[in-house]
UniProtKB/Swiss-Prot annotation:
The lineage of its organism: Eukaryota, Metazoa, Chordata, Craniata, Vertebrata. This is Translation initiation factor eIF2B subunit beta. Component of the translation initiation factor 2B (eIF2B) complex which is a heterodecamer of two sets of five different subunits: alpha, beta, gamma, delta and epsilon. Subunits alpha, beta and delta comprise a regulatory subcomplex and subunits epsilon and gamma comprise a catalytic subcomplex. Within the complex, the hexameric regulatory complex resides at the center, with the two heterodimeric catalytic subcomplexes bound on opposite sides. The gene is Eif2b2. Its main location: cytoplasm. Belongs to the eIF-2B alpha/beta/delta subunits family.
Length: 351
């Protein structure tokens, strides 16, 4: 069928284009954009490709998912969305196969630990499976649309009048959170500039335009100012499996200062940033960029004598974090393992 061939060719080009974008670091796209685009491509894969049963479909999704994640391992959102789709396929197949939802939801610790050794037969064919999966993916896309608004809606529960809030760098989620609180509360924000990228300046400008009293400071002043701060509110790139963070460089310093002064540290992050990865996975954790901002290339004499690294991310241990605020509510870092079991199947942690 020429129509099907044309569709397949167009889809292959779109996936190839997305993979090339990932290889270049994703450009100016946000994690939410990446999540939405990944889901859109996977939905097209499910509708356009011919598959006979859930097993065939999961193999297809895994194959394309590995290709996407390998293009740029630090962009964990892509892999997270692939795992969410695999979980959806398992759930929809289970419903048609006659497995009860209750047995899935109330998993014992023993079942969570041993599920990797059990295998389920996905070879049965069910006609409604495709439409059910597409409907579930559409619901997930709708959920993605409202993640920032759902997080911002909780702002008044955490920010009170005349408080001093500290943040670092630029986060759209944190900006929306603070803007929402500013509609009914008056407070002061201190933004660490997050050198060498200095995204804190962009955050300060945006908050000032919203009528929020904002001060920018250097990263070196974080500890000195922390004694005046009531709360630290930050965003993150990834929430790791042990409840720790992969956040912008400088966040670990901020978290240590907050811990020393017993200042609560709140992390605003949607659920699609929750990843089953651990900090030991170096390929996907670390990301380095050109150190020109730290040590300009014009300093030729010095450059000959030193080796300079400019990491983009910091590791923040879970014991430095007070609370996660996501689109489904607030949770302590110790609860992350439970959220993980609700979002991803243990067999899909490694694609």
């Amino acid at each position: 069928m020429p129509g099907a061939a044309a569709k397949g060719s167009e889809l292959s080009e779109r996936i190839e284009s997305f993979v090339e974008t990932l290889k270049r670091g994703g450009g100016r796209r946000t994690s939410e954009d990446m999540a939405r685009e990944t889901l859109g491509l996977l939905r097209r894969l499910i509708t356009d490709h011919h598959w006979n049963n859930a097993g065939d479909l999961m193999d297809l999704i895994r194959r394309e998912g590995r290709r996407m994640t390998a293009a740029h391992p630090p962009e964990t959102t892509v892999g997270n969305m692939v795992r969410r789709v695999l979980k959806i396929i398992r759930e929809e197949y289970g419903r048609l196969h006659g497995r009860s939802d209750e047995s899935d939801q109330q998993e014992s610790l023993h079942k969570l630990l041993t599920s990797g050794g059990l295998s389920e037969d996905f070879s049965f064919h069910y006609a409604p499976l495709k439409s059910n999966i597409i409907e579930a993916i559409n619901e997930l896309l709708v959920e993605l649309e409202g993640t920032t608004e759902n997080i911002a809606a909780q702002a008044l529960e955490h920010i009170h009048s005349n408080e001093v809030i500290m943040t670092i760098g630029f986060s759209r989620t944190v900006e929306a959170f603070l803007r929402e609180a500013a509609q009914k509360r008056k407070f002061h924000v201190i933004a660490a500039e997050c050198a060498p990228f200095c995204q804190g300046h962009e955050m300060a400008v945006n908050l000032s335009e919203a009528g929020i009293e904002t001060t920018v400071m250097t990263d070196a002043a974080i500890f000195a100012v922390m004694s005046r701060v009531n709360k630290v509110i930050i965003g993150t790139k990834t929430i790791l499996a042990n409840g720790s963070l992969r956040a912008v460089a400088g966040t670990h310093t901020l978290a240590l200062a907050a811990k020393h002064h017993s200042t609560p540290l709140i992390v605003c992050a949607p659920m699609f940033k929750l990843s089953p990865q651990f900090p030991s996975e170096e390929d996907s954790f670390h990301k380095f960029v050109a150190p020109e901002e730290v040590l300009p290339f014009t300093e030729g004499d010095i450059l000959e004598k030193v080796s300079v690294h400019c990491p983009v991310f910091d590791y923040v241990p879970p014991d430095l974090i007070t609370l996660f605020i996501s689109n489904i509510g607030g949770n302590a870092p110790s609860y992350v393992y439970r959220l993980m079991s609700e979002l991803y199947h243990p067999d899909d942690h490694v694609l």
